[in-house]
Amino acid sequence: CGIDYYTRAPGYNNESFVIYMFIVHFLIPLFIISFCYGNLLCAVKAAAAAQEESETTQRAEREVTRMVIMMVISYLVSWVPYASVAWYIFSNQGSEFGPVFMTIPAFFAKSSALYNPLIYVLMNKQFRHCM
């Protein structure tokens, strides 16, 4: 299940599909994730500033910051290889690419659903306690 990089028929519009996939399924989610997590970090910092700067507040702020950074990194690790390979193949049409070249990035992209729950379980004591 993936993009058909080999069909070169003019009626298939592969170029517009790759551009659409890159923008709608990679760049826009990356922007939304960055925007939302950035706002979350600002809200946590504002809440911490409003409270007395205790060790507990600072520790909670560090934990949230670490978790947000891990979430963004996991998104990038999962989707940058796939988006890069798709863009590379799009830019080098007519070149031969082996199945491993396309399979490994697809594996990373499709395994992305595992990363967020793992990050929550490994990095959040309250989440672990509730399980």
UniProtKB/Swiss-Prot annotation:
Extracellular side: 1-16, 89-100
GO molecular function, one term: G protein-coupled photoreceptor activity
Gene Ontology cellular component terms for the protein in this record: membrane; photoreceptor disc membrane; plasma membrane
Record's keyword terms, sorted: Cell projection, Chromophore, G-protein coupled receptor, Glycoprotein, Membrane, Phosphoprotein, Photoreceptor protein, Receptor, Retinal protein, Sensory transduction, Transducer, Transmembrane, Transmembrane helix, Vision
SUPFAM superfamilies: Family A G protein-coupled receptor-like
PTMs per UniProt: Phosphorylated on some or all of the serine and threonine residues present in the C-terminal region.
Source domain of life: Eukaryota
Residues carrying sugar: N14
One record GO biological process: visual perception
Localization of this protein: Membrane; Cell projection, Cilium, Photoreceptor outer segment
Record membrane topology: Multi-pass membrane protein
Keyword Ribonucleoprotein annotated: no
TM stretches of this protein: 17-38, 67-88, 101-122
Residue list for modification N6-(retinylidene)lysine: K110
Cytoplasmic side: 39-66, 123-131
Family classification: Belongs to the G-protein coupled receptor 1 family. Opsin subfamily.
Role, per record: Photoreceptor required for image-forming vision at low light intensity. While most salt water fish species use retinal as chromophore, most freshwater fish use 3-dehydroretinal, or a mixture of retinal and 3-dehydroretinal. Light-induced isomerization of 11-cis to all-trans retinal triggers a conformational change that activates signaling via G-proteins. Subsequent receptor phosphorylation mediates displacement of the bound G-protein alpha subunit by arrestin and terminates signaling.
UniProt-recorded name of the protein: Rhodopsin
Record organism: Coregonus autumnalis
Gene: rho
